[in-house]
């Protein structure tokens, strides 16, 4: 039962594939061999997709396949269609000229004469090809420059000894004036610091200095004289040696090294043992040490002696 069920369902699909293959073989035998392998495979796949499931793949439908084939044909093979472009001659825009393009490699007799002339002119005027014919399109380039040739130069005409004359264009320029560096500075007239001895000429600065000195003298007289304070008798004066100012804050800095601020170092205080004059230190202690040595270290010698 299962085998019959599956064969009944798959039978229409198999028949469709067989029919599609037969159609492709017949078409291939009838047509000339113009299709490549890629085009043949695409056509085979598109036919199968259209027959079996065109709804799932709308891009593979027959209409899209025809449109794509037409576009590819237009790109690969140039069709005979008119192309228009403006043609200029003698500074007059003529009517648009129709040009037909074709694949045939024939002589240029099919093109109109006006188009043949335009194609032949740049070849004749090419500098690499020896030809002395004038270029009709570039007639404005052959005309002399009105400003450089026809009109005389106003600055150079009928002026004798032109290099010795002063520069007319730069006559207002300060850099071209003679001895400009020796002239007084015009821009620093209002600058008080630029003019020399401005205050000394009028005498105001010297007068103010005298007044300030007199005021300082009066203030010094009014202030009481400062008497140095004497140390009291009860206060003990320190007899520490005075260090130089460079050594108060540690050693001198080394060249290229930062200064290390260290606290002042106090002098070292050495403690000496007190002198002992008692008999205890010189007599009793040595006798006790000898007895300990005899009883503990050498007991045999002690017994033999006694």
Curated annotation (Swiss-Prot):
Coiled coil: 13-39
Bilayer-crossing regions: 279-299
Keywords: Coiled coil, Membrane, Transmembrane, Transmembrane helix
Chain residue ranges for the region called Disordered: 44-76, 103-204, 216-249
Compositionally biased spans, kind Low complexity: 119-201
Presence of the UniProt keyword Coiled coil in the record: yes
Predominant cellular place of this UniProt entry's protein: membrane
Localization per record: Membrane
Assigned GO CC terms: membrane
Residue spans of biased composition, Basic and acidic residues class: 218-235
Bilayer topology term: Single-pass membrane protein
Superkingdom classification of source: Viruses
Name of the molecule in the record: Uncharacterized protein R335
């Amino acid at each position: 039962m299962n085998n019959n069920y599956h064969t009944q369902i798959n039978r229409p699909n198999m028949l469709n594939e067989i029919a599609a293959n037969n159609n492709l073989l017949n078409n291939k035998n009838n047509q000339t061999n113009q299709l490549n392998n890629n085009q043949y495979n695409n056509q085979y796949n598109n036919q199968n997709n259209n027959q079996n499931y065109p709804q799932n793949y709308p891009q593979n439908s027959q209409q899209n396949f025809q449109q794509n084939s037409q576009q590819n044909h237009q790109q690969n093979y140039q069709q005979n269609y008119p192309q228009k472009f403006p043609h200029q001659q003698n500074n007059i825009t003529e009517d648009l000229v129709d040009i037909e393009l074709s694949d045939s490699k024939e002589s240029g007799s099919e093109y109109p004469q006006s188009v043949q002339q335009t194609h032949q002119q740049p070849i004749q005027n090419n500098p690499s090809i020896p030809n002395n014919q004038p270029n009709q399109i570039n007639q404005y380039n052959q005309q002399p420059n009105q400003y450089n040739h026809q009109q005389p130069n106003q600055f150079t005409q009928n002026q004798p000894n032109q290099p010795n004359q002063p520069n007319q264009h730069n006559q207002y320029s300060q850099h071209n004036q003679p001895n400009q560096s020796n002239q007084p500075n015009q821009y620093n007239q209002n600058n008080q610091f630029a003019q020399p001895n401005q205050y000394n000429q009028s005498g105001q600065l010297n007068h103010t200095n005298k007044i300030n000195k007199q005021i300082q003298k009066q203030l010094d007289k009014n202030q009481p004289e400062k008497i140095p304070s004497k140390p009291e008798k009860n206060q003990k004066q320190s007899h520490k040696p005075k260090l130089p100012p460079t050594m108060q804050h540690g050693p001198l800095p080394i060249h290229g090294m930062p200064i290390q601020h260290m606290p002042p170092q106090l002098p070292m205080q050495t403690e000496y043992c007190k002198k002992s004059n008692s008999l205890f230190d010189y007599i009793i202690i040595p006798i006790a040490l000898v007895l300990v040595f005899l009883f503990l270290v050498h007991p045999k010698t002690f017994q033999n002696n006694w």
